[in-house]
Amino acid sequence: MIAKAVAALLLGSGLASAAGTPLTSKAGDKVPIPDWDLKSSSEVSKDLKGLSKPGVDTSAWYHAGTSKCTLMACLLNAGIYKDEDLWYSDNLNHFNWGQFSIPWLYRHEFALAPAKGKHFILQTNGITSKADLFFNGQQIADSEYQAGAYAGRTYDITSLAAKDNAFVVQVHPTDYLYDFALGYVDWNPYPPDNGTGIWRDITVKETGSVSMGPISVVVDIDVPVESSPAKVTIRAEAQNLENVAVVLDAEAVVSGNSCSGGPLKQTVKLAPGEKKLVEFTKTIAKPKIWWPKQWGDQPLYNAKVTFSVNKAVSDTAQTNFGVRKVTSFVNQYNDTQYSVNGHPFQVVGGGYGADMFLRWDGDRFTRIVEYMLDMHQNTIRLEGKMEHPELYEICDKYGLMVMPGWECCDKWEAWAYNDELAIFPPPVWDDNDYQTANYSMIHEASMLQPHPSVLTFLVGSDFWPNDEAVVLYVNALKNAGWQTPIIASASKRGFPALLGPGGMKMDGPYDWVPPNYWYDTEPSEDRLGAAFGFGSELGAGVGTPELGSLKRFLSQSDLNDLWKNPNKNLYHMSTNVSSFYNRKIYNQGLFKRYGAPTSLDDYLLKAQMMDYEATRAQYEGFSSLWTASRPATGNIYWMLNNAWPSLHWNQFGYYMHPAGSYFGTKVGSRIEHVAYNYQKKEVWVINHSLDQTGPRKVDIELIDTNGKQIAKQSVNINTKANSGFKAADISSQIGKLSSVAFLRLILSDSKGNVLSRNVYWVTNSIDKLDWDSSTWYYTQVTSFVDYTPLNKLSAAQISVTTGSSRRVAGVPGTQTRTVTLENKPSVPAVFIRLTLVDKSGNDVNPVSWTDNYVTLWPKEKLQLEVGGWDASGDSIQVSGRNIAATTVKL
């Protein structure tokens, strides 16, 4: 094993320099290598030491103008391939995968300014999944040492550094079953390169005699946090890089939110090569508390640490942090329940999908966070896709909690007791694997620790780590100052004694189930994913894109297959060996419940109704039963988004278009809400807030498909913060229905302000589930409800008027318009779909609607708002179940 490593992990900040200008300019600078030349090893010299000397001609190599990219991402960046070509139809299935079956080389030349007393540290943060490193003609690491996609390593290159420098990284082909990588399991087809390459920045850091490790910030505060002081401990490891003793002057400054007091100082003596943890403690008497978005503000403090030797800066770094407290416990039902700042916290979220080629786009992720908050989600789960520091900075800023953790179904869970891998017996870990896993956890813990948005860490997903691995994981986390719950796994298959039960269930579903599934909770031992306990990944598998997106990645033949061949395997689903390679289960429900589609447009509108009712019911079920006798403590929808354009498993499409699954989620997760329990035919009131209490009114009305009133009542209640409770039993009214009817629920406050408006299409029966025949991914329906009368609705006529454009503060370029819908006839206008388009008729994405896919009562008027992140919106396309499609100019 070859390595010239510095034990400390170094973090900091800096800006890349132009060619010929030294990459770093002063102590404390930490600069990513800005771009790469790359080439297959079959096309270059085998003399890698020679290739790592300055002056090599790389004019025939590919050039990627980005600091980080897997092989595929680099080639896309270089213009060799295009997304629209790769994504179209099944083109990816015909790609030349073989070119990545051998090593590839990354190369970059850069300048430095070596001088006495200067040190240069090269740090890897993420290479998938193993590599040989060469610098200025010398090998500094082999692929046994530089192994693991998350195993950040540091290398002291001071003795090799020169004015002109060359660096070569030889990456080896990744095998998910044998390497610690970033796999996709059955989420989507595997990328042709299996994610091989430099997917995170490789940085060069300049220091003086003493280098600084990552800063951690330990915050101790009692509840109630609102009236308690916070003890803040700032920690960073100092390492003497000299062969003589040095005296270190260390200083820390805490700032932000009117934080008072001067610098914290201390002097530290370091023997040659010695490492020592330097700690500073400060008490903030009246701290500003960081809250999840739905509960409050997100004030951030800053901690800056500076190491000086002989009155000259040797190293410096800073990090933001927040004052908050996260705990968890496993209740009497073996379910995990979180608490944030002393308040029970129901996890409401989705499972994140990284880009198939691991390309990071901070602006795109910001839009994703804004979408999640618009859907009233509070948590995002990252299964093995921990991305980059910027992700957590964005979540800190916006108030979205994060559940990072290791992934399932590959080398990360190659335990002797794991009988579910694609290979048997499992390729169990050897000594080097444990070392790789240890360095992976050390690196990720140091990156994650200061961020207040981090809710927890899952050291296992489908299976729990063995005793040897869990000790490494827990020690690495604790040594980093970890303060949030460490969870053994996202399932209840087992657990290590050191951590105890994980308290999360992974019992499905992953494919379509009807809305009443979530409310059918008894007996709970047989009800799998229904709304009780903590569901770490579950959902009805929905997420059908609308036509504007579908045309971007499907051929006409593919589009025809959607509705003409309902059982056909489809490339834009999961992998071809998974249980999710077709829409058979989903389409059975659609055809049986809504009737066979008569066209692609008819299929897509029915699909949006299916998707809308599916996600709405899931979130309403968990929210309603949050304070039940066996509480529904958490719910992660599988999945939030996709790695590529997909036909299922998302709350919004790859092209950022929000459709039925999005608005079903948004309605079902409202902070104050009123919902229909399909199983018991009851009306429930939901309150996710901490402070919104007092009198409320629930208006309940049933009408038939012709608009005739069947029943109407109002219920006055007092809402309870952070709870769900029954407001009314309407089983007698529902039981008398002879056909499909529409149920409208309106929740209002004491001033008459509408807090939630919610419309269902219902019958006197529900879909019948055969729980005894359940599989790991769905529960069979033996009898379906009949919504086919919706195909014979009388035509409604609506008017659509738009208000003047206005700017939204804090969002540059955003345009917002009011859109008023009025249903003039005496029949309901059902499932009205509104799509913002540009002058060419293409979808404007991302886009924000206060509501969409709405159903209007006869003579009802409803005002909505639409906002886009640019000014390209030109008109609104309007369609629905029983209205004529039209386009309204803005």
From Swiss-Prot:
Propeptide part(s) removed at maturation, as residue ranges: 19-26
Residues of the signal peptide: 1-18
Spans through the membrane: none
Domain of life the protein comes from: Eukaryota
Main location per the UniProt record: secreted
GO annotation terms (biological process): chitin catabolic process; polysaccharide catabolic process
EC number: 3.2.1.165
Entry protein name: Exo-beta-D-glucosaminidase
Residues bearing glycans: 194, 334, 438, 576, 687
Role played: Hydrolyzes chitosan and chitooligosaccharides with retention of anomeric configuration. Has no activity against beta-D-galactoside, beta-D-glucuronide, beta-D-mannoside, chitin, glycol chitosan, cellulose, N,N'-diacetylchitibiose and pNP-GlcNAc.
Subunit organization: Monomer.
Positions of the catalytic residues: 462 (proton donor), 537 (nucleophile)
UniProt organism field: Hypocrea virens
Similarity comment: Belongs to the glycosyl hydrolase 2 family.
Keyword Glycoprotein: yes
Any one Gene Ontology molecular-function term assigned to this protein's record: exo-1,4-beta-D-glucosaminidase activity
Record key words, sorted: Carbohydrate metabolism, Chitin degradation, Glycoprotein, Glycosidase, Hydrolase, Polysaccharide degradation, Secreted, Signal
Pfam families listed in its UniProt record: Glyco_hydro_2, Glyco_hydro_2_N2, Ig_GlcNase, Mannosidase_ig
GO cellular component: extracellular region
Compartment(s): Secreted, Extracellular space
Catalytic activity: Hydrolysis of chitosan or chitosan oligosaccharides to remove successive D-glucosamine residues from the non-reducing termini
